[in-house]
Amino acid sequence: MRNASQLVAFVNAVAMCFAFTPAEGLPLPACFDHLSTSDTDRKWGWMWGWKDELPEEKRLYYGPVLARKPTFVSMRFLPVLYATFGRAGEADDHLEDVRSGRLSDIARRIIELVTQKGEVQTRRMRAELGITSREGRTQYGKALDEVQRLMYVARVKAVGEGREEYNYTYDLFVRRYPEIVRAAEPIASADARARALARAVKLAGGLTEKQAAKLFDWGEEPLRRAVERLAAARGVVRLERGREAIVVLRRYADAA
């Protein structure tokens, strides 16, 4: 790949991939491995612009989705990943994740601020939340990743010129991508998780259950049900290898 259109075509073909470098121990595609240059600076130069430009145009989705790393998702596959959360579409959907500990209090405040204010810049958001200390900024950065990973909040666009002014605007996922939310409505969360896992296994050829857990962070029981669902449909085979279970495509089972 050497231009934005080729990147879009690549992501459409794989459905989801790491936006930059691979994640350690996770054999899924990473864009840096498919760029038509070996120059690291050029790779970053190309990708840094594309990861702002293409999501703003809604040609790709970008966020910390897989293994909490920067991820590209095709617009066709995005409803499947959104449906894995099984949201009711209510304004207080996030409170269950707060109670369960999946969202921090700062994450809750970010969601509620964006709900009230609409699309808002990072700098203004921090100011509105009263975050000024170094520790507070670190916690805020982690919380912003949390709300994007769980698809409560989505990045909209880059704004500002130069290093000092450069930042992003964010809005609620449901306001930024209403068409994705509508497309996700008919997909049951269990079906969505099975489809997402099937795609990951197809891309990798096989994954240990530990790798799948790191990739999606669904929790032990939803992951177990997704594996069972795929195995029942004869899409994958679950193999015991010592203390670890491996989920592989059926056609690779004999070689695993």
Task: For the regions a language model picked out, list residue spans one by one.
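Long, low-complexity intrinsically disordered regions
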Residues: 1-256
